[in-house]
Regions:
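Helical segment within the ABC ATPase nucleotide-binding domain
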Residues: 67-79
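Conserved catalytic loops of ABC-family nucleotide-binding domains
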Residues: 76-85, 93
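Catalytic Walker B motif of ABC-type/P-loop ATPase nucleotide-binding domains
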Residues: 53-56
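ABC ATPase "signature
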Residues: 110-111
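Conserved "ABC signature" C-loop
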Residues: 1-24, 123-128
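A short, proline-enriched helix->beta-strand linker immediately N-terminal to the Walker B motif
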Residues: 47-51, 80
Length: 129
């Protein structure tokens, strides 16, 4: 549990609290910030070391420091672990190998990150009509 809490950045905000990990968080995490709630959710996902992690905007409410910590942790996944990341943040693309771009429910680009990003820059990817 401590490994998951450390990896997700939960201990970064609980270590300064006298209650530590026993701190009250309120119903639905109401006493936590949005970024703290995301850190707790990520810690729960890390707990079982699942072979596939599906994360939808996992750092959307985090500050830059917390996001960098999570990016570093996700970049450390083992080759046997797969991350499926849904994001609008281009900074999160640093940790992926493959990019799939979707628009209106259709795939408009799919391939190695460098190829897809290059195609997007050159206007080779067309929007769905």
């Amino acid at each position: 549990m401590m490994d998951a809490a450390n990896r997700a950045g939960v201990t970064a905000f609980t270590q300064s609290d006298p209650a530590g990990l026993e701190r009250q968080v309120g119903e639905g995490g109401a006493m936590l910030s949005g970024g703290q709630r995301q850190a707790v959710t990520i810690a729960r996902a890390f707990l079982g070391r699942p072979p596939v992690l599906l994360m939808d905007e996992p750092t959307s409410a985090m500050d830059n420091r917390s996001e960098m910590h999570i990016k570093h942790q996700l970049a450390q996944l083992k080759p046997s672990e797969t991350l499926i990341l849904i994001t609008h943040k281009t900074s999160m693309l640093d940790i992926v190998d493959r990019v799939i771009v979707m628009e209106k429910g259709s795939v408009i680009a799919d391939g190695p990150k460098s190829q897809v990003l290059n195609d997007l820059k050159q206007g080779k990817v067309r929007a769905v009509s």
